[in-house]
Amino acid sequence: MKKLISLVCTASIMASILAPVASAINLSNEAQTVRYSTEITGKQADVEYRLENGEVTYAKITAGENVTERIGNIIYLNGVKMATIHEEPANYEDETVQPCTGWMKQDKCLYGTVPADYTKPISETNRNIELENNIMSYTIDALSIAITIAFGVSGDFLDLATDLLKNISTMANNAQYKTLYFHEVIKGHKTLPSMWQQVNCKYYVDSAHKKFACNDTFYRAWG
């Protein structure tokens, strides 16, 4: 069970690093490589991503003995294909901010956490992580990092991966579930919407969004 939860976390982190970072930066057409270190799932992690024409074309997280990469919409774990990311933006309003490290996951916002203060619509996206194997076959760490890569936020999604696997384990016929269906709504704070944003996510195990797994609300800061 512990091994399973770890892999799910990894997949989510990978999906996260690519998409929001690319859409939030207004860059020149020159290719740019960004590297930094952070802590993910309690381990020191080295993060690298490449930007070309304002889009992330490659991302890699090295944490301990595991190397998770995103090439296009494919996530690889130690060189083996782990998942495919499918994104369906519902709405999007581009924000121009200065490139720096990238989006950093926060439990709180500098300007507070009152929902009514987040008045600037940023994006609404269906982002699905189609895993190669049953969701329950992955470790917490691996799933956590995959979520990070999919959502383009540097941070720890260990609690989310744990909740996902815990809830899915109680569902009947859970061996059939291979895809995580995420519905993500991002809103910017009224004071500085391009730098401080609230992310609300709901997670399902079916494409019709009928079988609810869990939800998560966090904040991201550009830094």
What are these regions (language model features)?
Residues V34-A63:
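N-terminal targeting signals for Sec/Tat export/insertion, comprising classic cleavable signal peptides
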Residues A150-L158:
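Short hydrophobic alpha-helical membrane-entry/anchor segments
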Residues A208-G223:
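Short, low-complexity, Pro/Ser/Thr/Gly-rich segments in the mature regions of secreted, periplasmic
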Residues T68-I71, I75-G102:
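Non-catalytic propeptide/linker segments at domain boundaries
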